[in-house]
């Protein structure tokens, strides 16, 4: 016999399925559950304190198409303490962000199919030692430069390498993953890396926007990682061993070793 009147403290409303809370946002970001964040419409909780007060910064983007204008920017880059540089995998496009004052910066974009002068001469200047560059995945970029007979000098920081030293268990060190882990924000899709992004078949505006966003993200990661390396006393390991090793490995890979 089934007893149907057994005492049981239960209210159906207590078992209602509740919508995920925004409190899950940091956890989902750390676990890279970006699709679940989008599915549930989660947003960063408002009670999470910002790492620092936002700074007003005016950034002027400019497409550089002539050798004369390029030389103006190269002179600016050479005077800077450092610039943030991001290149397309095939070197057909480069964006360089450079601070011009405490609250102003310029973002110069260079594209092979729009540049009216010697593209390789421009690349030789950009990747020479007199321009101090912050970038991402420096070893791979240096190998590509060597394959094209270009210099590999002047790299002073690699955010992917720094991300690895700061957390060797993260597993992913692409720009979007690093940005999500440290800033709890999801970057837009890297449209600039799609095969036809800058062709007539692609959405050039979306690709250019993404290219600028990811370059800015590299700069933001540098501002976070550089002091963190100092705090953890990793300065010597990073600047004296790991970063110089990038060029050594790039040359070995280029030589087929």
Residue positions per predicted region:
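Non-catalytic nucleic-acid-binding/docking modules located in mid-to-C-terminal regions
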Residues: 1-59, 149-156
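Generic surface-pattern signal
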Residues: 4, 29, 33, 42-45, ...
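Short, structured coil/loop segments at alpha-helix boundaries
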Residues: 21, 30-37, 42-46, 115-120, ...
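Conserved DEDDh/DEDDy metal-dependent 3′-5′ exonuclease domain
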Residues: 62-229
């Amino acid at each position: 016999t089934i007893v149907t009147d057994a005492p049981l403290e239960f209210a159906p409303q207590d078992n209602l399925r509740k919508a995920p809370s925004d409190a899950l946002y940091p956890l989902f970001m750390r676990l890279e559950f970006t699709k679940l964040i989008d599915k549930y419409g989660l947003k960063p909780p408002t009670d999470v304190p910002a790492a620092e007060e936002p700074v007003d910064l005016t950034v002027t983007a400019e497409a550089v198409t002539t050798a004369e204008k390029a030389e103006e920017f190269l002179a600016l880059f050479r005077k800077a303490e450092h610039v943030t540089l991001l290149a397309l995998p095939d070197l057909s496009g480069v964006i360089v962000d450079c601070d011009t004052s405490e609250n102003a910066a310029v973002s110069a974009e260079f594209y092979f199919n729009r540049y009216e002068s010697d593209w390789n001469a421009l690349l030789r200047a950009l990747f020479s030692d007199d321009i101090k560059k912050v970038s991402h995945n420096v070893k791979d970029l240096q190998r590509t430069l060597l394959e094209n007979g270009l210099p590999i000098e002047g790299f002073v920081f690699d955010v992917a390498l720094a991300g690895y030293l700061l957390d060797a268990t993260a597993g992913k060190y692409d720009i979007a993953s690093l940005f999500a882990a440290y800033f709890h924000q999801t970057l837009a899709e890297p449209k600039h890396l799609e095969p036809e992004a800058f062709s007539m078949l692609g959405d050039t505006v979306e690709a250019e926007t993404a290219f600028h966003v990811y370059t800015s993200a590299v700069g933001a990661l540098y501002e976070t990682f550089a002091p963190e390396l100092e705090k953890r006393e990793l300065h010597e390991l990073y600047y004296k061993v790991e970063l110089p090793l990038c060029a050594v490995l790039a040359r070995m890979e280029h030589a087929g070793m």
